[in-house]
Amino acid sequence: MNLNATLVAQMVVFFILWWVVAKFIWPPLVKALDERAKKIADGLAAADKGKAELELANKRVDQALTEARNEGAQRIADAEKRAQMTADEIKQNAQAEAARIIAQAKAEAEQQTVRARESLRDQVAVLAVKGAEQILKREVNAQVHADLLNQLKAEL
C-alpha cells in the first residue's frame, strides 16, 4: 500500500466535504427533520385531542338526546294528565248539570202535581157545592140522593 499524495488529497477533500456538510448542510437538514417530526407530533396530538373532543361531543349529544326524550315523555305524560283532568272535570260538570236538570224537572213535576191537586180540590169543591145545591133544591129522597151521589162520582 502506497500512501501517496492522492490519498492525502482525497482525505483532505473528504474532511473538507465533511466539514461543509456538518457546518452548512447538516444543521438545516436536522432542523427540517426536527420541524417535520414536531409537525407530525403536533398533528398526532391534535388528532388525539380531536378524537377526545369528538367522544365528548358524542357523549353530550347522547345526553342531550336522552334529556330531550325524557322531557318529551314528561310533556306527553303531563298533557295526558291534563287531558284526563279536563275530561274528569267535564264529566263532573256534566253530572252536576244532569243532577241540576233532574232536580229542576222533579221540582217542576212536583209543582205540577201540587197544581193539579189544587185544581182537583177546587173542582171537587165546586162539584160538592153544586151537588149540595141540587140536593137542597130537590126533595129529600133516598133514591134521589143516591142518584146524585152516583152522578157526582161519575163527574169526578
UniProtKB/Swiss-Prot annotation:
UniProt keyword annotations, A-Z: ATP synthesis, Cell inner membrane, Cell membrane, CF(0), Hydrogen ion transport, Ion transport, Membrane, Transmembrane, Transmembrane helix, Transport
Entry membrane topology: Single-pass membrane protein
GO cellular component, as recorded: plasma membrane; proton-transporting ATP synthase complex
SUPFAM superfamilies: F1F0 ATP synthase subunit B, membrane domain
Principal subcellular localisation of the protein: membrane
Alphabetical list of Pfam families matching this protein: ATP-synt_B
Regions that span the bilayer: 7-27
The keyword Cell membrane is annotated on this UniProt entry: yes
GO molecular function: proton-transporting ATP synthase activity, rotational mechanism; proton-transporting ATPase activity, rotational mechanism
Function: F(1)F(0) ATP synthase produces ATP from ADP in the presence of a proton or sodium gradient. F-type ATPases consist of two structural domains, F(1) containing the extramembraneous catalytic core and F(0) containing the membrane proton channel, linked together by a central stalk and a peripheral stalk. During catalysis, ATP synthesis in the catalytic domain of F(1) is coupled via a rotary mechanism of the central stalk subunits to proton translocation.
PANTHER family: ATP SYNTHASE SUBUNIT B, ATP SYNTHASE SUBUNIT B', CHLOROPLASTIC
HAMAP family: ATP_synth_b_bprime (MF_01398)
Subunit structure: F-type ATPases have 2 components, F(1) - the catalytic core - and F(0) - the membrane proton channel. F(1) has five subunits: alpha(3), beta(3), gamma(1), delta(1), epsilon(1). F(0) has three main subunits: a(1), b(2) and c(10-14). The alpha and beta chains form an alternating ring which encloses part of the gamma chain. F(1) is attached to F(0) by a central stalk formed by the gamma and epsilon chains, while a peripheral stalk is formed by the delta and b chains.
Protein name per UniProt: ATP synthase subunit b
